[in-house]
């Protein structure tokens, strides 16, 4: 079965490996992810979602594998995305999702346990990524 969700993984290494994450004003802390549209590859979907949710242009650099969420039944494809510019420590991007929201972006230390502010599905996704990138 093909992946129906794509997750854009943007990493930075400043002595600690960080992953790009954001705070959704209604749904807590999350990773950039969304649905794969008909005829779209999961890598292209990850790049598109990164532009829509974060305003970042990127290229899909590396496929990090697929994960089946037992919570939702969706299959997620993780793609490491490379961005051309240096990204700040934090910023806010207005995303058009669900009528429009300000998403607050930040860097989460990948090997740190996520707090209770993360939805359980994203905690599980981070566990998958920690194992994949270890």
Q: Each predicted region: which residue ranges?
A:
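Conserved N-terminal beta-strand and adjoining loop/helix that marks the start
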Residues: 1-19
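Short polar/acidic secondary-structure junctions
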Residues: 13-14, 68-70
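Conserved Nudix-box catalytic region and its N-terminal flanking loop in Nudix hydrolases
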Residues: 15-52, 56
């Amino acid at each position: 079965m093909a992946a129906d969700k794509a997750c854009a993984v943007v990493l930075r290494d400043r002595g600690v490996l960080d992953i790009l994450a954001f705070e959704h004003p209604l749904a807590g802390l999350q990773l950039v992810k969304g649905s794969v549209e008909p005829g779209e590859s999961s890598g292209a979907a990850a790049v598109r979602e990164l532009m829509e949710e974060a305003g970042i242009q990127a290229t899909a650099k590396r496929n990090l594998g697929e994960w089946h969420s037992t919570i939702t039944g969706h299959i997620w494809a993780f793609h490491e995305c490379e961005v051309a510019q240096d990204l700040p420590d934090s910023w806010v991007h207005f995303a058009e999702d669900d009528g429009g929201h300000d998403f607050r972006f930040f860097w989460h230390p990948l090997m740190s346990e996520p707090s209770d502010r993360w939805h359980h599905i994203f905690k599980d996704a981070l566990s998958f990524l920690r194992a994949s990138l270890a």
